[in-house]
A protein has these predicted regions:
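A composition/biophysics-driven feature that prefers long, compositionally simple stretches
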Residues: 73, 80-81, 89-92, 101-116
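Short, charge-rich binding segments
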Residues: 65-69, 84-93, 145-149
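Short, glycine/charge-rich beta-strand/loop segments that flank catalytic centers
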Residues: 77-89, 159-162
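Segments that shape or occlude catalytic/ligand-binding pockets
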Residues: 33-80
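Active-site loop segments of alpha/beta catalytic cores
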Residues: 1-39, 45-49, 93, 99-108, ...
């Protein structure tokens, strides 16, 4: 039997390991706090301290015990930058100048500091400084903790920011304004995206300088360029504004840590963008959501030799449904995506509070049972 790390790396090299590797609890495929507590109640365990003590997100805990119980092959290292920049200052703003409103379990930006800014204001706007938001000591302590767990896991660096270039630009500028800017004010978009790319590049540099030798994968701050039925912006606009900055960020990662695989997150019906994600240098794309507009088997056939897929498990209906439905989805997804390697099974997004703990457990037992190579005929 392969070690978890070898299992993951074999799959990402487009070869078949002993079974399909499994992931959970990354930046976009985590266990929300309420589900975490419910799962612990089922197991009779006490919670661990939160890795985000500010408790400002829906996912604030990370429990290696639960990952071991589920048979997950990856472990994550948090750069700390999201937690630090989420802290609210005396003016009510976070590290990016955003202010938030809370609705139910979630919060969203309600004050957008650059909504009316011109290019000069954008260029002068203060953004987080890497040395102030990423500290070496907790990162190195976490790496040592993972190495002491007893199994050799694939180590994933979590994203250095909650939002990618597109989504953070929307938050700072305001969603509707940024979308209009894409069509009418190209110099504003180029200035803002350029500033963010330089900020993120500095964050990635510092994280990799501390942890790069230990990491096997790293999550790039993700962007949703598509909705459930198709693109939010045109592929041409992606090429105009985002392709070059993301290419530069990935080259920056590879220059510091050539061995590290880059995970790129983009929700929705992303088929029109997949070739572009390959062009920018992404090694893995998450989440490949199961949507009517997404033909999983066709995407595997067309792109599976050039990029790996992570995710694929529906979190909107399947995970709230029957255990039989979960088993059926796992079987279908493995059949569509796992042949020849290049697939890591994971939720398509964070598992929410309405997921019964038994369904979380069943997802991963089914994946271990059905994901053994060589794949069964008809899987």
């Amino acid at each position: 039997m392969l070690t978890p790390r070898t299992r993951v790396l074999t799959a990402l090299n487009h070869q078949e390991p002993d079974r399909v590797p499994l992931a959970l609890w990354g930046s976009w495929y985590g266990v929300t706090d309420r589900l975490y507590f419910a799962a612990l109640a089922e197991l009779g365990w006490e919670p661990v301290p939160p890795f985000r003590p500010e408790l400002l997100h829906s996912v604030n805990y990370y429990d290696d015990r639960l990952l071991a119980h589920l048979g997950v092959d990856v472990r994550h290292v948090d750069p700390g930058s999201i937690g630090v920049t989420s802290r609210v200052g005396p003016d009510g703003a976070d590290g990016y100048g955003l202010r938030y409103s809370t609705s139910g379990l979630y919060r969203s930006a309600s004050y957008h500091p650059l909504a009316e800014a011109g290019v000069d204001e954008i260029m002068a706007f203060p953004l987080p400084r890497a040395e102030e938001v990423i500290a070496a000591e907790p990162i190195l302590a976490r790496i040592a903790q993972i190495r002491a767990l007893g199994d050799e896991y694939a180590i994933v660096g979590r994203a250095v920011a909650s939002y990618g270039l597109f989504e953070m630009a929307q938050s700072l500028r305001r969603h509707d304004q940024l979308l209009m800017d894409l069509a009418l004010e190209p110099e504003i978009v180029h200035a803002l995206v350029g500033r963010l790319a330089e900020c993120y590049g500095a964050l990635l540099d510092r994280f990799l300088d501390i942890a790069g030798d230990a990491l096997d994968l790293i999550e790039l701050p993700g962007d949703d360029f598509a909705g459930n039925n198709g693109p939010i912006i045109s592929p041409k606009m992606y090429d105009t504004y985002f392709k070059a900055p993301y290419t530069a960020l990935i080259r920056r990662i590879k220059a510091r840590a050539p061995h590290v695989k880059v995970i790129y997150h983009s929700d929705g019906a992303i088929a029109p963008f997949l070739s572009r994600f390959i062009d920018i240098g992404a090694d893995v794309v998450h989440p490949l959501e199961p949507l009517p507009a997404t033909d999983m088997a066709a995407l595997k056939a067309e792109f599976g030799g050039r990029i790996s897929f992570m995710g694929g498990i529906d979190i909107r209906k399947t995970m709230q449904g029957s255990e039989a439905g979960i088993v059926a989805e796992v079987k279908e997804r493995i059949g569509q995506l796992a042949a020849g390697g290049g697939y890591i099974l994971a939720p398509a997004n964070h598992l929410q509070a309405d997921v019964p703990p038994r369904n979380l457990f069943r997802l991963y037992t089914a994946a271990r049972e059905l994901g053994t190579y060589p794949l069964a005929t008809g899987t």
